[in-house]
Amino acid sequence: MDGLCYVIFIIFSLLSCAFSPLSYASPATFSRRHLLQAPVTDPSTFSPPFFPLYSSTSPPPPPSPPQPLPPPAPTFATFPANISALVLPRSPKPQTPSRTLLIPAISAVLAAATLIALAFFFYGRWRGQTSHFKDESKSLASDISQSQQQTLPCPPPRNNNTQNKLSVAPSTSDVLYLGNVVTSSGSGFVKPESPDISPLPPLPARSFLLQHHSEANLDEEEEDDDFYSPLASIAGQESRDRRINPYSNCSCSISSHSDSPAMSPSAAMSPPMNSTAPHWSTNQNTHSPSSPERTVRNNKRYGGQSLRMFSLWNQNLGFPRISSASTSPERGMIRTPDAYARSSMYSSVSTTPDRFFRKVLDSSPPRWNDFSRNVKSLFLSSTSASPARDFCINISESSRSLKSSWEKPELDTTQQRESAAAAVTLPPPQRPPPAMPEPPPLVPPSQSFMVQKSGKKLSFSELPQSCGEGTTDRPKPKLKPLPWDKVRPSSRRTNTWDRLPYNSSNANSKQRSLSCDLPMLNQESKVLDPRKSQNVAVLLTTLKLTTNDVCQALRDGHYDALGVELLESLARVAPSEEEEKKLISYSDDSVIKLAPSERFLKELLNVPFVFKRVDALLSVASFDSKVKHLKRSFSVIQAACEALRNSRMLLRLVGATLEAGMKSGNAHDFKLEALLGLVDIKSSDGRTSILDSVVQKITESEGIKGLQVVRNLSSVLNDAKKSAELDYGVVRMNVSKLYEEVQKISEVLRLCEETGHSEEHQWWKFRESVTRFLETAAEEIKKIEREEGSTLFAVKKITEYFHVDPAKEEAQLLKVFVIVRDFLKILEGVCKKMEVTSSLA
């Protein structure tokens, strides 16, 4: 109506501009006709035009008071003599205005008439379409209400105060679903008795438009009774014209219907309003067009209420879950934990669900862009995925943006809302219906979107071997056996293994039952040290004899049958005195069984003085090898002494060095250590060392083979090199150990005779074999002692030969051989140098 009034105002303005030239034409013509007769007057006396030139918004200035006209001059008519010749003045005929002024006026009138006709035509067409949509929505509402009455038993309708008021449900009891149409004139939403939901047939596309409360008072109801959702309240704050848009202004209890299962943003996202919300009647807003300030105030009040209701709904319900378009109507509803216990919401089946929902999102207000953009992105992704997949819409970010945009208007109108809320009488709250048992909560899938690729999925048996095997292709490192025979058997040091309790990897000892502490059948006892037991186990694996054979060889004293290695292993695993007592105390009839290694040692303990026998037999078996080693060492030292005394070449080198080193030539001797410094001392010519000049003289005297003779000195004194590697103190220690071992063997025989085992047959064999050994051992020891004395005498003689005091070198008797070894290395280097120079010459 405002637009129509604006068009009519423009038409009248055009008409006034068109007729204004005619009004200006009549006074001009009048003045032209009476120019000769009328007196000259002031131009201010003319009357203003009919349509003033002032703006329509400001009133014209008041007219000036009329001024009195001056009295006309008296004129007397003079008549000539010939009165017949008198010509009386006649007024000419009025001339019609020019045709050029009529053409614009006629065209302006025609244009105004055309605009008026077009305005009435479009207005009538708009009224016709609106009434047609109202009829369809009313018929659809009646059909759906009949179908609901037939399918679902409903309780009696609730009482409403007025027809034009919105029926409001409690926020905690009812939740509206798609497919239900609730008008203000009808009863409120009815909760079905059964939680099962029956699908509805497809609905026409045009039923998405809003239903208004009456046809007679359409304009007044649009201005007075506006029901706001969070989306509609935003639109109402922007402009008054946006409030008329049916897509942006939606009631909380009106469900939009279309052939799409997806909800419109305004209907789906509007929260259930509280039953205590104020009802606004038509009488409160009858003067809203004439009072724009009140309209803005009402809009802010509605926006604040819808904001509070939307924030409460968002906290109670959380994130709504909307399923994508499918053939089942149950997949297109919002599912929340409270919705299952309260009511059901139906959604229609659509053949093109995404296209219509995108149109609705495009027509939404700009402040809902966050939510629209979120829903569009989900619909675009749902087209590529399976239609039966579920997806979630996150409206937390949209609610935050809406809250930030609404906080400032709420702060400005806080006092107005408080005064308005105090003035409105609130109806008593309705009793909520009994709650139904809640089903188990739905667990969202871990992956909201999943694209199914064409192809057969491989089972676990069909997977490639590389997926399960991992690193089986790598070659495993070869494990080496742990040398347990190198572990000391009688270690008295405490370490980490000794501090750990036995079987510490099991459960706590306090939690064990009493049966675990009792001895069980075939339970092995751990008497020996773990390391010692492991050594015995390794020995048994390498043993080629049985336990009885080993015991018999120990009784008879046959050390050849056992061997040195076996005897050494038995000597290392000798148990301590406590372990021997424990092993002897065990009997064969005992419930607790011994380990194989402990059983082996227990059988060995049946032999008297078994481990002393082992030591004695080990000494007997290794005696010959030790004697041979000592004899070889003594013979090498004696041969080295003879070689040093009888070497002609060594004597020539020492004499030539003595002559070249002393300028006077009267030197008689020098210390043997001086041979090592001949390389560093220059000769008389000052160009070469003394050793170089001595070797050169020897080669010249011997001829061509002289250099080769000097080099062969190293091979002649080879025994001296070997003697230098020996340690005379170690040799003498080995001799003393050998003598002690023989003494231990004789002690074993003495112990056996004292204990009374000498009459036994087994002991007699052992004693016979040991006595024979002692006889041969005594003779060999005497020989070793004689060789040791002769060797010591030869070393002292050769030391004195090279002018070394043997008393000072008693700690290092073999030092002479060490000096000779080092001198031979220097001599070989000089010979190689001379060969190189001779070859170049």
Curated annotation (Swiss-Prot):
Top-level lineage group: Eukaryota
Membrane disposition: Single-pass membrane protein
InterPro entries from the UniProt entry: FH2_Formin, FH2_Formin_sf, Formin-like_plant
Biased composition (Pro residues): 426-444
Domain FH2 as annotated: residue spans: 469-841
Biased composition (Low complexity): 254-278
Pfam families, per the entry: FH2 (PF02181)
Residue ranges, annotated region (Disordered): 137-166, 254-297, 403-512
Composition skew (Polar residues), residue ranges: 139-152, 279-293, 502-512
Keyword Translocase appears in the UniProt entry: no
Stated induction or repression of this protein's expression: Up-regulated during gall formation induced by root-knot nematodes.
Chain segments annotated as transmembrane: 102-122
Residues spanning the signal sequence: 1-25
Predominant location: membrane
Functional note: Might be involved in the organization and polarity of the actin cytoskeleton.
Protein name: Formin-like protein 10
Organism: Arabidopsis thaliana (Mouse-ear cress)
Gene: FH10
